A protein has these predicted regions:
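Loop/turn elements at helix/coil->beta-strand transitions in domains of secreted/extracellular proteins
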Residues: 26-28, 56-59, 81-85
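Extracytoplasmic "Venus flytrap"
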Residues: 30-53, 61-74, 78, 89-92
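Residues at structural and domain junctions
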Residues: 9, 35-36, 82
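Extracytoplasmic ligand/sensor domains, especially the bilobed periplasmic-binding protein
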Residues: 93-98
Length: 98
């Protein structure tokens, strides 16, 4: 149930965000997964949510299986090419701040 709520929240946020960008270039989205995209759990649901944005015209790309301790360089790399970057684990907080 928590996974479904998280997925709905991500999709709802982007739906609301897309309304304000009518006629404008859609933001590109980057994401970092803590596990593999087909793990049957959190990472898979996050991946499915992010990939669903592509059918609405968003440019989406991400990196999977990123260790939390080594995430800062991945976030910097994604931030250079995307307008918004999502961390899918609380453990990524320090890496995002750097």
């Amino acid at each position: 149930m928590k996974k479904l709520i998280a997925l709905v929240a991500v999709v709802a946020m982007f739906a609301a965000f897309s309304i304000s960008t009518v006629g404008k270039k859609l933001p590109s989205v980057g994401y970092v997964l803590v596990g593999p995209k087909n793990d049957g759990g959190w990472s898979m649901r996050h991946y499915q949510g992010f990939k669903s944005l592509e059918k609405h015209g968003y440019k989406v790309s991400g990196v999977e299986m990123v260790p939390e301790a080594e995430s800062s360089k991945i976030f910097r790399k994604l931030a250079r090419k995307h307008d918004i970057v999502f961390a899918t684990s609380f453990g990524y907080m320090d890496g995002m701040v750097k």
